[in-house]
Amino acid sequence: MNENLLKKELFGKPISKQVTRLASEKALKVSKENPKAYVIGSDNMCTLDDKIFDKPIDHKDAVNHLQALSGNKHLQNNGISICFDGKEIWSNFDVTELVMKELSLQEIEDYLDLDKPYSACGCYHLESNGRNLFSSINGLESTVMGLAMEHLIEKLNELSIIEL
């Protein structure tokens, strides 16, 4: 699966469709290579209005991301897919709304130096010092971290893949 090519194909479609399709394609690829295993795929997209914030390409891009999110409400969108025997058996979409505090350039630079969140869409790690960047979080924190665990565990239990 070429993720960049797929993102271009999905451009303009609803975020829920984009993120669940990306999760599905990731899981399907591995599932076809491991047909007797349950495979979980996941994808996240950070959005502010109609703009998607991918992982930053460099430090300057990271600063620009955080400056755009500073003082604003944005969404972390998560898609999950479970595949078995090369077929998708379940998918889920979840969204968490976050409001970032107003940040100065120095606060942004200090945060980037501290957490180095360059591999995260939105350019922050909620599970670490990034938590301090927000005035409110409405939804599942696990969605922000890349995998809506509550929904996944519930489905794995329902499918008797795990037992709670």
Predicted regions and their residues:
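Residue-level signal for inorganic ion chemistry
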Residues: A23, D43, A62, I80, ...
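N-terminal polybasic phosphate/anion-binding patch
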Residues: M1-Y38, K51, L103-Q106, E150-I153, ...
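Anionic-ligand binding region
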Residues: V63-Q67, N78-I80, K87-S91, V95
